[in-house]
Amino acid sequence: MERCTFAMKVKEGKMNEYRKRLGEIWPELVLFLDRNQVKNFSIWNAENLIFGYYETVENTVLSTEEEHMRQKLTVRMEETFDWISTPGEPMRLMYHDFGVVRENKELIRHRVFMTKLKPGCEEEYKRRHDGLIEKRGDTVTQGPDSNFSIWSSGGYIFGYNEIDTTMETEPTEEEKQFTIEWETRQLEIMDWITNDVDWLTGEHHAASIRLAWHA
């Protein structure tokens, strides 16, 4: 399985039109996804940002006809947004903890977050998260987090996490303290767009919302 992502910024005053056009192309888009074995496709929004996530068979290459269809669908939307990611190129994977991926999504909830890196801080962000991977070592995360990945493009960070609700528990005092220390340090290198740490900072940000999903 190959994980793929994309990111865009909706043009000022165009969010209603973006949603409308997404609805107009949706039946054709679903057929396109199914023909090309694209799974777990979702589109997320916070403020004027859009983040998309999906999964494909590894090393899949679209046929000429399907590439033409992809471009045709994109053209019908593109007046409403500017690309953050580069079409046809993967976003940079900054962190992953895929763990045990749940094939059945009925008992998972999503956490999708967005931040803006401060100038020159992309490598420091990557270094800190590489440290988490090194600390984890060969341990496979059983849950509740699963299929967790963080991506970057254009100075933005986008996180995608599938959380098994049957395994969630109240955090211990040690876990709370680690989170506070980690998120406080992260504020040195990035600013939040979504509301994930409003409880810590006292600020008020947008929640990420799912605009669309297709299994």
Task: State the predicted function of each range.
Residues 30-51, 55-59, 137-166:
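Short, glycine- and small/hydrophobic-rich beta-strand elements in well-ordered beta-sheets
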Residues 14-37, 121-145:
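Short amphipathic alpha-helical segments
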Residues 6, 18, 44, 53, ...:
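Tyrosine-centered aromatic motifs in long, intrinsically disordered, low-complexity repeat arrays
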Residues 26, 73, 133, 148, ...:
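Tryptophan-centric aromatic hotspots in well-structured domains and transmembrane helices
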Residues 32-39, 56-90, 143, 163-207:
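An amphipathic, aromatic/His-enriched active-site/gating alpha helix that lines ligand/cofactor pockets
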Residues 2-17, 108-123:
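Short glycine-/aliphatic-rich beta-strand segments at the starts of folded cytosolic domains
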Residues 92-116:
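Surface-exposed beta-loop interaction hotspot
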